[in-house]
Amino acid sequence: MSNLGYSFVPVHPGEIIKEELQSRGISQKRLAEVVGVSYTMLNDILNGRRPVSTDFALLIEAATDINAELLVNMQTRYNMQIARKDKNVMAHLENLRKICATLL
């Protein structure tokens, strides 16, 4: 049921931001300075090692005009995909479904 018959693979929103910076010729260091975050934080986000928060998405929207809601929604879809690939999470959910099925 989690597949729903299609194979859409969510992209970390950092990839979109990274591509936009490259197309505009803006360095990560410069963007970090402009929006007021550390270079390390920005680099981690752009490389998918850190999630995009709502606050960060708003900063990026102000700086680049990339829609903040789009970035946050992308992050949510990405997080869901990661959770669905986690065998421990899925085993816990399956166990929970079995328990709840006996209660209802």
Task: List each model region and its residues.
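Short, charged recognition helix plus adjacent turn
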Residues: 72-104
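DNA major-groove recognition helix of helix-turn-helix/homeodomain DNA-binding modules
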Residues: 55-73
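The alpha-helix within a helix-turn-helix
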Residues: 21, 32, 61
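Short alpha-helical DNA-recognition segment
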Residues: 26-44
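A short, Lys/Arg-rich alpha-helix, primarily the initiator
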Residues: 2-26
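Residues in the recognition helix of alpha-helical DNA-binding motifs
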Residues: 20, 34, 45-48, 74
